[in-house]
Design a protein with these regions (language model features):
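Short, flexible, surface-exposed loop segments at domain boundaries
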Residues: 2-181
Length: 181
């Protein structure tokens, strides 16, 4: 499990965080311990039988690990039943299987944390042309809302180190027999 680009425990991941993962079929002989999926469930989600995760990571980790950033195109006011401010971005970097590979709108609001130079900024710090990283959560009506926006690498690196130290403290408190740092 990775969060903010560093190893994490599931307890470190806030509820609702949009995650990416790699999954396997159960080990031979373990299939009986897992409830079987109905034909209807498998039709809706053909990958549902792959239920053993060997990698889970948040958006900032997933995209930065693969060399992807986002370029801000601007903001616009959304419409519909729950109008919210939208951050218009386009992907910068390689095409990623299982990722967002076209320009997209992310919901932003006053609860979105915007980081620059290791400090919290307000929405006025967002400018077209900036290259950013984001963490997402599920918004209303199947939209993706931003929880965090990092306007520079320094801020994301600081978050990565904070998470790494949190994970090391957890491992030490659980008496892991050895650790190579």
């Amino acid at each position: 499990v990775y969060y903010h680009g560093a190893p994490a425990d599931l307890r470190d991941i806030p509820l609702g965080t949009h995650m990416h993962g790699r999954f396997l079929l159960p080990i031979k002989g373990e299939e009986e311990t897992i409830p079987t999926l109905s034909a209807e469930q498998l039709k809706r989600n053909p990958a549902g039988r792959y239920n053993h995760a060997f990698l889970l990571e948040d958006d900032a980790t997933f995209y930065s690990r693969q060399g992807r950033s986002w370029k801000i195109l601007g903001t616009e006011q959304g419409g519909g039943p729950a109008p919210r401010l939208k951050l218009s971005v386009e992907p910068i970097g390689p095409k990623i299987e299982g990722g967002i590979n076209q320009p997209v709108l992310f919901d932003i609001d006053e609860s979105t944390r915007i980081w620059q130079a290791r400090q919290l900024m307000n929405m006025e710090a967002i400018e077209p042309g900036q290259i950013i990283q984001v963490n997402l959560t599920w918004g209303p009506f199947e939209s993706l809302a931003t929880t965090d926006i990092w306007l520079d690498e320094e801020s994301l690196a600081a978050f990565r180190e904070i998470q790494r130290q949190r994970h090391l403290r957890l491992i030490r408190s659980r008496f892991l027999p050895a650790w190579v740092d």
